[in-house]
Structure formats: C-alpha cells, structure tokens
Amino acid sequence: MKLTILHKIVNRVIRKCQSVLGVCTLGSRAIVLNPQNQVLLVKHTYQPHWYIPGGGVKKRESAKAAVLRELKEEVGLSVIGEPELFSIYHHTYLGVSDYPIIYIVKNYSLTNVSSPEIEKMGWFDYGNLPEMTSPGTMRRLNEYFTNCPKSDT
C-alpha cells in the first residue's frame, strides 16, 4: 500500500514537471488474445486497476519495439510474426498529453517470467472482466469486441 501512495506522489510530481516543460508521452500496449478469445490483463504492484499489458516507449525506440519489449518483460510473451496496429489514441492526464498506441496480438509463445512490476496476470472472457479493470482498458476492449467506433481518447 505504501508503494502505491509513493508511486502516486512521484507520478504527480513527474507529470507536473512534464506539463510545465510541454512534454508529451508515448505508450504502447497490446490486446493479447488466446485461442479461446480471452484477453490477457495485468495488475501492477503500484496501480489498483487491471490493464492490457504495455508501457512507455523509450527514446529512439519504435512503438512496435516497445510493445514487444514490454510484453516480454511484464508477462514473458514473445510475439510470433507482427503485432497488428489497432489504433492510436490521445488523452491528457495531469496536464500532459499522452499518446497510447494499441496493437492486437494473437500469435505468441509464453515463458514463465516474474516481473517486480506485475502483481497478477490472467486471461479473461470479455463478458467476465475483473471488477477493477481500468476505464481506458474497458474502452479499448469494448471497441475491439463490439466493433463499436473507435474513439480518439
């Protein structure tokens, strides 16, 4: 619990500095589906919600390279072939523009991995997602599973 509070404080300070400097952030995430059409979600040690896996794009790294790296680091997943681009979004959080890029991944191999960032991971049916699924994750999954129009945010 202390880590979550500390993370929130540090995150707010970083976001305030980014806002003052006019920095934008770029993220890369994946909707990973198994053969039963279940989606992979992760719960971080420092966040209360469940998310589709992914993270920030590093300097001189492509969004695709970032999602491949994050999937390997967070859940031990190696993508076979190419991830499919789903959409690019924009939202503002604490005054900072963030651009998450979402991919679809259906072909992969999994190895056992332990990440200090990940508290839990699991496969879920779209109709039976965890109660604490993040609002952004819910929007992305609704767009994917119901074919509703994709939003900008």
Residue positions per predicted region:
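NUDIX/MutT-family hydrolases
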Residues: I104, V113-F145
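Conserved Nudix-box catalytic region and its N-terminal flanking loop in Nudix hydrolases
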Residues: N34, Q38-E74
